[in-house]
Amino acid sequence: MAGVSVKDVDAQKFITAYAAFLKRSGKMTTPQWIDIVKTGTHKELAPYDPDWYYVRAAAIARHIYLRKQVGVGRLCKVYGGSVNRGMRPSHHRDGSGSVQRKVVQSLEKIGVLEKSDNGGRRISQQGQRDLDRIAYSLLEEESE
């Protein structure tokens, strides 16, 4: 297991595996409003996937793992998109700050993230160990 990190694994496979791990573990609580909320003003509908909250949490955990520290505002920019304005030119809209904040708070509650001294969140030692362990299991599956 030495030397295996999240960078060594395909992003989509890792996010799917980590989302399944988060759902299976049962530690992470989901808000009641996740089935009706839009993920940003640029969206017309709520997500179709019933497990989208776990997928977003896995993607945010991977995003913060690959960087030193990330704030909620930066995550809103990352998960934003262009708004459809008909015939007029499209413009970028940020993603929902509430969704990003609740996901980060959920990850912080289970010990994956911790607050940084300079603002924002960073990955904790326990979180890094969990993410590396899942990356190692994915590499083992690929080698078989």
UniProtKB/Swiss-Prot annotation:
Chief location category: cytoplasm
Annotated disulfide bonds: none
Superkingdom in the source lineage: Eukaryota
Region (Disordered): 83-102
Subcellular location: Cytoplasm; Nucleus; Nucleus, Nucleolus
Protein family according to the UniProt entry: Belongs to the eukaryotic ribosomal protein eS19 family.
Function (record text): Component of the ribosome, a large ribonucleoprotein complex responsible for the synthesis of proteins in the cell. The small ribosomal subunit (SSU) binds messenger RNAs (mRNAs) and translates the encoded message by selecting cognate aminoacyl-transfer RNA (tRNA) molecules. The large subunit (LSU) contains the ribosomal catalytic site termed the peptidyl transferase center (PTC), which catalyzes the formation of peptide bonds, thereby polymerizing the amino acids delivered by tRNAs into a polypeptide chain.
Further facts: There are 2 genes for eS19 in S.pombe.
Name the UniProt record assigns to this protein: Small ribosomal subunit protein eS19A
Organism this protein belongs to: Schizosaccharomyces pombe (strain 972 / ATCC 24843)
Gene from which this protein is expressed: rps1901
